[in-house]
Amino acid sequence: MEASLGIQMDEPMAFSPQRDRFQAEGSLKKNEQNFKLAGVKKDIEKLYEAVPQLSNVFKIEDKIGEGTFSSVYLATAQLQVGPEEKIALKHLIPTSHPIRIAAELQCLTVAGGQDNVMGVKYCFRKNDHVVIAMPYLEHESFLDILNSLSFQEVREYMLNLFKALKRIHQFGIVHRDVKPSNFLYNRRLKKYALVDFGLAQGTHDTKIELLKFVQSEAQQERCSQNKSHIITGNKIPLSGPVPKELDQQSTTKASVKRPYTNAQIQIKQGKDGKEGSVGLSVQRSVFGERNFNIHSSISHESPAVKLMKQSKTVDVLSRKLATKKKAISTKVMNSAVMRKTASSCPASLTCDCYATDKVCSICLSRRQQVAPRAGTPGFRAPEVLTKCPNQTTAIDMWSAGVIFLSLLSGRYPFYKASDDLTALAQIMTIRGSRETIQAAKTFGKSILCSKEVPAQDLRKLCERLRGMDSSTPKLTSDIQGHASHQPAISEKTDHKASCLVQTPPGQYSGNSFKKGDSNSCEHCFDEYNTNLEGWNEVPDEAYDLLDKLLDLNPASRITAEEALLHPFFKDMSL
């Protein structure tokens, strides 16, 4: 019997399913790694073939990044004298517009090379393949270091980010894609670099000449595409009688004409459903920008927040009515009114559906409003989400605020949404629904929310998410970086009553602290005290700056130059 028991004990050790599973997983990971290396090697060979002159200058070692519009490789410059120099090679996709490529290069050459803005060393081209050579900055992953940064390191990080933003904003450059992966950080050397100007736009007074040209080309292209669909009021006298057909149709529709704001006049919906502009300074300089709102037009969109959106024409009758009404309305609006900003939103003479949860056939027949929407989900400002046509450098400051929010809360990504309406609802859970609605009115947008959501106290929110109360630090798995994978807004947000999902301390599995584990606890206490020094005494100035960065009104949002002078950075050298 003892021998029998011995066999039963040995069998699980010799043929352990758990061990077999670990071996299988290890083998699978090894195969995936080999497959990845083979793919990288193939990509490097293709790059050498596409741009042969690279082989004379660089030895490409690895592929270190890949995005929608480019791939980045690590290379060593083969210099005849001096030490080897590491170079980052950015290979732009062949379908990139030549003007866009030239504009990105001009941003790097004019504004880059100082104040934490990446510069450029060389540029190579062969046919439609362009490679930009930039200094290589070895950097850490934001996610890996997020929960080990000391409070002083966070101050230094934000200070250097604002230096970079001040630099590019002085040249009239709107980066449009400010996020941790585009702000490289070498923790050991304390070096920083703002990179990737592929989506950059120019302000109205930009000093980057090619950004002006990009805007002009983009606007002319949209105007030419919609020229055949535009009906002006020049041939219809203002005091003339209303056409009989229009008069008869208007009696069948119980709708009152709504005066057009600047945004409503300029943006229409074409017959083919494409976005277009009637013409007048609608900025959209990004070629090939991705549409991050592909889910927003689906019928199961969130009922919590409803924008006054424009959709395709639903029937021929409403299209005729809208077309003839536009012919008269366009004549009424003179050039002075056309130049008004989107903040002038008339309160009178609106149609029946205005500021309600319904959209009338007249509004459905209008062309969709065109506005710049390029950027990364989770970092886009409210004015971008609501398609405000007049966007400024303030959108970069909002993105910086989201980064600061992640640093203070220990959560990344903080916002995670599949479409614009969900993203707006998540912003409301932090900043408040009433505040969001009021701010939207300042740039001519009407937002409806089914339930009022109060604004959160930023200090309480960040301390709760980091696992600390206002007085004593509490140890949670956030310290080991486990909670950084959880967005502050859950993916399962209830859109009928959007709310913040919080995880109480001690409910994480895996690496959570346990009372009986004295060795690991002692080690983590030491690491906690070393790396998280200062987190139990976060000053009010930090949350005041965060509040100003996340100002829902872009007109009053703090600028990079003002942020550098904020008391949060006192006693720090600029």
Swiss-Prot record:
The active site is at residue 177. The keyword Ribonucleoprotein does not apply. One of its GO terms (cellular component) is intercellular bridge. ATP binds at residues 64-72, 90. One of its GO terms (biological process) is positive regulation of nuclear cell cycle DNA replication. Transmembrane segments: none annotated. Forms a complex with either DBF4/DBF4A or DBF4B, leading to the activation of the kinase activity. Interacts with CLASPIN (via the acidic patch); the interaction is required for phosphorylation of MCM proteins and CLASPIN. This is Cell division cycle 7-related protein kinase. It comes from Homo sapiens.
